[in-house]
Amino acid sequence: MAVKERVGVVVSDKMDKTVVVAIEDRTAHPKYGKIVVRTKRYKAHDEDNRAKTGDRVRIQETRPLSRTKRWTVAEILESVGA
């Protein structure tokens, strides 16, 4: 089975080895057709604390690492500081 991957923006890096990644999903409303933007936030494991707030990252699903953490940072796509 394929590994689930998502691309999103880091919105918080205040925890040790953990970042909060916001994933934006744009879908059409089933009845009215208007594009609705829904945001979901995932906690992701960042072993080296490399990701900073504002970075675009790719996260991968993994085994449960804590009560709320089931994703890990696979790579940093765009860094805000660089």
From Swiss-Prot:
Key word Disulfide bond present: no
Gene Ontology CC: one annotated term: cytosolic small ribosomal subunit
Coiled coil location: none
Any Pfam family matching the protein: Ribosomal_S17
CDD domains to which the protein is assigned, alphabetical: Ribosomal_uS17
GO MF term list: rRNA binding; structural constituent of ribosome
SUPFAM superfamilies, alphabetized: Nucleic acid-binding proteins
UniProt keywords, alphabetically: Ribonucleoprotein, Ribosomal protein, RNA-binding, rRNA-binding
InterPro entries: NA-bd_OB-fold, Ribosomal_uS17, Ribosomal_uS17_bact/chlr, Ribosomal_uS17_CS
BP-aspect Gene Ontology terms: translation
Binding partners and assembly: Part of the 30S ribosomal subunit.
PANTHER family: 40S RIBOSOMAL PROTEIN S11 FAMILY MEMBER (PTHR10744), SMALL RIBOSOMAL SUBUNIT PROTEIN US17M (PTHR10744:SF1)
Annotated function: One of the primary rRNA binding proteins, it binds specifically to the 5'-end of 16S ribosomal RNA.
Family: Belongs to the universal ribosomal protein uS17 family.
Protein name: Small ribosomal subunit protein uS17
Native source species: Synechococcus elongatus (strain ATCC 33912 / PCC 7942 / FACHB-805) (Anacystis nidulans R2)
